Amino acid sequence: MVNQVATDRFIQDLERVAQVRSEMSVCLNKLAETINKAELAGDSSSGKLSLERDIEDITIASKNLQQGVFRLLVLGDMKRGKSTFLNALIGENLLPSDVNPCTAVLTVLRYGPEKKVTIHFNDGKSPQQLDFQNFKYKYTIDPAEAKKLEQEKKQAFPDVDYAVVEYPLTLLQKGIEIVDSPGLNDTEARNELSLGYVNNCHAILFVMRASQPCTLGERRYLENYIKGRGLTVFFLVNAWDQVRESLIDPDDVEELQASENRLRQVFNANLAEYCTVEGQNIYDERVFELSSIQALRRRLKNPQADLDGTGFPKFMDSLNTFLTRERAIAELRQVRTLARLACNHTREAVARRIPLLEQDVNELKKRIDSVEPEFNKLTGIRDEFQKEIINTRDTQARTISESFRSYVLNLGNTFENDFLRYQPELNLFDFLSSGKREAFNAALQKAFEQYITDKSAAWTLTAEKDINAAFKELSRSASQYGASYNQITDQITEKLTGKDVKVHTTTTAEEDNSPGWAKWAMGLLSLSKGNLAGFALAGAGFDWKNILLNYFTVIGIGGIITAVTGILLGPIGFALLGLGVGFLQADQARRELVKTAKKELVKHLPQVAHEQSQVVYNAVKECFDSYEREVSKRINDDIVSRKSELDNLVKQKQTREINRESEFNRLKNLQEDVIAQLQKIEAAYSNLLAYYS
């Protein structure tokens, strides 16, 4: 049963990562407690070392590790077998997967000791708990009804935000959280919700169907929301077993092979560009041919069943490698970096404090006064970096908002060619028939919305790349400013103690000696549970992609569509009516439609460009403002802590007699305790690396 090994290995590796997370979380918590206890003891001895920032950061990191999960977002159009796939993955017939029903709400599947479903609403109502049968009955709809709702731009359950399904399953218990999206469509509310998860998941499982290879809707979604955004996507071609069933002679091996190869060529042609990382082709590690129904049937009969021939073993191996090796190692490396910083800060503070215990108050004040110029230099570095961020902010906000303005104003230049692919099938008699005119108008409105959505997505991708490039440049500047900052803090230590103190002994060749604020600014530290997917600096504690999302869902996709489509329908209708009942040339009718649409569109583009470019400006500005606020706060905290560390010692010397020997021992014990916790974290990380090597 060799292929069962993939499932077992996945569970075992998840368990191993969960154990390491737990070990590191405990060590971080003890590290925070150790430093905090020492700070409290400092009040009755030589004074606090002002390590509040380290205590706060490692406490947050410890909590994040405790709550750590790998979040998988399942995307796919209706009737692609998403629920069947998920049931096969978890090994239970949990989610509705009958022939007809479609899950109609976004569902978050996570571990819970008891089986329960909680519905969360968006209108202020309190969450509602349901049993599974009622959930399946109430929140699944027929595909025909789903299609009708989509055409009418309506949601099946407009008051529902999402559902949380808790279930005592091994896969979930070991740290997997699954988000099941209702389907691919262009409703703004749905996309806003789904895109929020797209930006905050570890991997996307994009479910397709062998019998419907790469539909227009799927290609549009990938082009608009996935392409070029640094996301990790696993493409799951479901119902591969039905390729054989579609043949006239299912036993014809040659015909089956030819049919499968044709399908593979189609999928490769459409998906290859999404399976390249830094120039390397990883198509075989990202695209999988699955037979979910076969896997589910086997696992329901025997959870340990051999899944050979279903495609699941290969998929599980790739997902396992990505999550428990690539992503887990990256996450835990940041934790190790944070622990090293806390250890170094403690050792630096102890190394400064011990020599100063020997000095009387006057000598101590004299030495503190002597380093005032250096502290002014630290403030100068802060001001210079802050100025660079603000200049970058202003340049990017102006440039990107202007690019949006130009982009919108130029839509009319290419509209006639661009709109052809969106134009609905034009039956003039349908339009002239009052009974069918509403359906025609709805189809036309949907065509405009798709056109505007695609155009907006294309521009947004360009804007994101520009912003990302700007943050990369700021990251390089942070490294340079950090190096200068370190030189000055070393000078402060030398002038205070009279010694050249080397304290960066826990830093290896793979890391630089940048101060904590610079590491944060460079994206080397993450204290945020969001922004898990893609882009350099995605690990940074601020979340610029979600800032953009929050603004851009308010913007012109909604604003442009509202401004344009509602106004266009009237003039277009008059133009078509003017052709007369006897006019049967559909081609000319189409040309008239596009011509009139362009004429009306161009009328409104200046207003849209003017109004929405300000929204774009504000969005980009807020991205850099949030970054600047956090960077400035962290630099200020560092400068203030260094000053207060010295002021605390002066205050204590002025008010009490300090027992130098006991204080020396206390500080040395603190240093040893901190190093001991760091060593445990280093060992846990190294052991995990050794296991995977």
Swiss-Prot record:
Give the residue ranges for region: G4 motif: 238-241
Residue ranges annotated for the Dynamin-type G domain, each copy included: 66-313
Q: Where is this region: G1 motif?
A: 76-83
Give the Cytoplasmic membrane side ranges.
1-521, 575-693
| Primary localisation category | membrane
Q: Does the keyword tRNA processing apply?
A: no
Q: Give the span(s) annotated as Paddle domain.
A: 572-606
Q: What is its EC number?
A: 3.6.5.5
Pfam families (UniProt xref)? Dynamin-like_hel_bact (PF21808), Dynamin_N (PF00350)
Give the region (Middle domain) as residue ranges.
Answer: 311-571
Segments carrying the region annotation (G5 motif) are 268
CDD domains (alphabetical): DLP_2
Q: What class of enzyme is it?
A: hydrolase
- In which domain of life is the source organism classified? Bacteria
* Family assignment from sequence similarity: Belongs to the TRAFAC class dynamin-like GTPase superfamily. Dynamin/Fzo/YdjA family. Mitofusin subfamily.
Q: What is this protein called?
A: Bacterial dynamin-like protein
Which species is listed as the source?
A: Nostoc punctiforme (strain ATCC 29133 / PCC 73102)
What lineage is on file?
A: Bacteria, Bacillati, Cyanobacteriota, Cyanophyceae, Nostocales
